[in-house]
């Protein structure tokens, strides 16, 4: 490819609305342009990277025995009503109507469509197991699209769905997909972790996320410092303290705290250790409960884990925090003065709180706290559950080592769905015993566009993107200095361009009438791994300057050796 016949579209300045580095660099490198909130046009450089990612995904899915299909983006509402997700999915599901006012959705996912296909196409257990995948556009009406293609409304996704007649068969395919995903992200040169995860709105039982480690990540990834244990923080178990609860040394005292409405203010004003404080959060109770709210207690320096809390049988789903008005109607005090003593609604305390003594908490009276609270003396020990986020230094749930926490970007997710969708849509085959058998399902997703952004978050420097070789838009950049004035430089540039292309190498020849500084800046911004610079001064000595983008090292290579050298660097 020649720059004179290509849309480079690089920008010198960083757009003001680009928050994270991947969004900034994708705009500056001419990979994407914003059309509307959460909607992006992919420009040629971006498409080249996207296709590289797609090809790796497709190769490994095919190698794992999956079969490619292509399903419609627009889906009839009847399927979503049949599965029960028409009401459950929420406002992210974009509902539309055709000219006959028939309702449809723009698909955020394709469980319903593939299950409908399979229930009509398969009839016998002898046809199973089967695993189908597609690389297709998805649409989710995000309330706040941000971070460029990291959280956009329209995106490209590889989604796969497997069908089985036994849990054992599902487990085999699940393990094969786990291995395929590991190969996919390894081939792309990404630093990632496969972690245990919550199944969320997709449903099902077992689940793993594939997280690319990056400071800009939206997820907290938890892993042991000595074992293979890894989990999303939503799922990581907080082990109960091993030490028995210390004996009480203080009497419970009612203290005026008119200006302490948060744990931070309480700690600062009364010089309390934060580990001796408890915060109380009120959430809505499950429908049909005799109480409107449930009180959840965690230590002052810990955070409530909303995924764990939502799984409590007495808590409404989705988890909904009570408003101040709802709190005052039940407790007669504001949110900053809540605690377990004389709490008139059910209470659930975290395991760490259960091990505390002589602690401070709200008195359920505005502007007052109790200090020196002790369980079973001042208030009965309520229900105990794991409802907090783990913190760095906590013991690993597998009993090996302590936990580390890093930020991650979710780029893949695999689920064991079980029979959730096949039961709802009555997808069955004739079993070995001649009777109808409901199918067991798995589903496996990769955010293809998100992978591109995640790769940039791991691979950049002050000059631009530093692509892993496998997904770079071009493999080699040829920069001929003063090409339009030097016949020797022009002739050699054309010769090398042809020879490298003949070797199957993707080359970008910068044949613009531009200053050398602009040419260098653009190639480094785009992130092409290998650059060769042709100039009269070096050619006087039969030399070509070679630069490797990742480490910035330069070396002079003889003109006659440069093609073989590049082929060896790229193909090994």
UniProtKB/Swiss-Prot annotation:
It catalyses: tRNA(Pro) + L-proline + ATP = L-prolyl-tRNA(Pro) + AMP + diphosphate. PROSITE patterns: AA_TRNA_LIGASE_II. It comes from the Bacteria. HAMAP family: Pro_tRNA_synth_type1. PANTHER family: MITOCHONDRIAL RIBOSOME PROTEIN L39/PROLYL-TRNA LIGASE FAMILY MEMBER (PTHR42753), PROLINE--TRNA LIGASE (PTHR42753:SF2). Homodimer. Catalyzes the attachment of proline to tRNA(Pro) in a two-step reaction: proline is first activated by ATP to form Pro-AMP and then transferred to the acceptor end of tRNA(Pro). As ProRS can inadvertently accommodate and process non-cognate amino acids such as alanine and cysteine, to avoid such errors it has two additional distinct editing activities against alanine. One activity is designated as 'pretransfer' editing and involves the tRNA(Pro)-independent hydrolysis of activated Ala-AMP. This is Proline--tRNA ligase. It comes from Escherichia coli O1:K1 / APEC. The gene is proS.
